[in-house]
Amino acid sequence: MSSYFVNSFCGRYPNGPDYQLHNYGDHSSVSEQFRDSASMHSGRYGYGYNGMDLSVGRSGSGHFGSGERARSYAAGASAAPAEPRYSQPATSTHSPPPDPLPCSAVAPSPGSDSHHGGKNSLGNSSGASANAGSTHISSREGVGTASAAEEDAPASSEQAGAQSEPSPAPPAQPQIYPWMRKLHISHDNIGGPEGKRARTAYTRYQTLELEKEFHFNRYLTRRRRIEIAHALCLSERQIKIWFQNRRMKWKKDNKLKSMSMAAAGGAFRP
């Protein structure tokens, strides 16, 4: 296609600026228009025309240059016969074109040169695109590394700031005085789960209140035991054990007193 566009009109139109552009005949009827254009093309090109017109609106200094057109089609133009329907003479509205000059004598066909030039241009364009792609990838990698470095920098700065900040001191434990401690707690973990239970240490106030209650009543009811336990911050079991131990002690004391009294009374007998 490139050779056709470049070398299509060099021999037939040597004086490109002097050539007058054609019009497509009379526009009064469509059939006459197509007939005129067909006859014009068949008479102008001199070979089998298939209906395509590539010379519309073409001046002396055309887009592709009128002096370099159609050098490789002289032989085809002279050898190929025109089809019957396109063999009509040109209409009177168009001036007949001059006879074509032999383009083969002017210059050889540059089709192979244009083909090689196209290959070279394709190779150059592919190499340029590959270089551009590599530079684009390298630039992306550079951007990615830069962004990663920027992300690492704030993280390291935050860590450094967190390390530089003084750690908050642990809250000071409130001071506990002896009277604030719970002394009546069963220490089950001292001798193990199956070991002996530790003795409960009663305070002086608790012992005094328990002695008063024992003086008035040696046996406590369930209701009274609950009241004393709540008043002295003790459990019902602790109150129950204390009263049991106190009764045993009282019995022992009374037994010794009775025995001493009995011994003293027997000695004074006459």
From Swiss-Prot:
It is found in: Nucleus. GO terms for cellular component: nucleus. It comes from the Eukaryota. Residues 75-175 are annotated as: Disordered. Its main location: nucleus. Residues 195-254 bind DNA. Gene3D superfamilies: Homeodomain-like (1.10.10.60). One of its GO terms (biological process) is regulation of mammary gland epithelial cell proliferation. GO terms for molecular function: DNA binding; DNA-binding transcription activator activity, RNA polymerase II-specific; RNA polymerase II cis-regulatory region sequence-specific DNA binding. Keywords: Developmental protein, DNA-binding, Homeobox, Nucleus, Transcription, Transcription regulation. The keyword Nucleus applies. Residues 75-86, 119-134, 154-166 have a biased composition (Low complexity). A motif (Antp-type hexapeptide) lies at residues 176-181. Signal peptide: none annotated. InterPro entries: Antp_homeobox, HD, HD_metazoa, Homeobox_antennapedia, Homeobox_Antennapedia_CS, Homeobox_CS, Homeodomain-like_sf. Belongs to the Antp homeobox family. Forms a DNA-binding heterodimer with transcription factor PBX1. Sequence-specific transcription factor which is part of a developmental regulatory system that provides cells with specific positional identities on the anterior-posterior axis. Also binds to its own promoter. Binds specifically to the motif 5'-CYYNATTA[TG]Y-3'. This is Homeobox protein Hox-A5. The gene is Hoxa5.
